[in-house]
Swiss-Prot record:
Residues 31-41 have a biased composition (Polar residues). InterPro entries: NA-bd_OB-fold, Ribosomal_uS12, Ribosomal_uS12_bac. Gene3D superfamilies: Nucleic acid-binding proteins. The keyword rRNA-binding applies. This is Small ribosomal subunit protein uS12. The gene is rpsL. GO terms for cellular component: small ribosomal subunit. Belongs to the universal ribosomal protein uS12 family. GO terms for molecular function: rRNA binding; structural constituent of ribosome; tRNA binding. Residues 31-57 are annotated as: Disordered. Part of the 30S ribosomal subunit. Contacts proteins S8 and S17. May interact with IF1 in the 30S initiation complex. The lineage of its organism: Bacteria, Bacillati, Bacillota, Bacilli, Lactobacillales.
Length: 137
């Protein structure tokens, strides 16, 4: 515990906020080749690699992921939700924030049903989260 005199000499520093989705906090001006401070809820990018990885210890699966080169020159790893996907290299995707707890380093989700990503086929419940259209009667 510091004394009052110590606090007068060197006050307490406010805690700095560290973003959970750093790639969404910057834009990119391609004309001047500089970062801009424009934050965004989603970002567009191009898939550079699509594959599967295994989750952390208590879980077991092959989780689908894509390495995405964003429009602000960041390269991030994003999770592909839902059963089955049509993504391949050079697919244009839209990403949002949201980590996957059992995949280390995956802080983003790909939005299904946007740009080149198809929605989940045959999905009846929670369709809006997976870009699935309403089935015809």
């Amino acid at each position: 515990m510091p004394t009052i005199n110590q606090l007068v000499r060197k006050p307490r520093k406010p805690r700095t906020f560290k973003s959970k989705v750093p790639a969404l906090n910057f834009g990119y001006n391609s004309m001047s080749r500089k970062q801009t401070n424009n934050t965004a809820p989603q970002k567009r990018g191009v898939a550079t690699r699509v594959g599967t990885m295994t989750p952390k210890k208590p879980n077991s699966a092959l989780r689908k992921y894509a390495r995405v080169r964003l429009s602000n020159q960041y390269e991030v790893t994003a999770y592909i939700p839902g059963i089955g996907h049509n993504l391949q290299e050079h697919s244009v995707v839209l990403i949002r924030g949201g980590r996957v707890k059992d995949l280390p380093g995956v802080r983003y989700h790909i939005i299904r049903g946007a740009l080149d990503t198809a929605g989940v086929e045959g999905r009846m419940n929670g369709r809006s989260k997976y870009g699935a259209k309403r089935p015809k009667k």
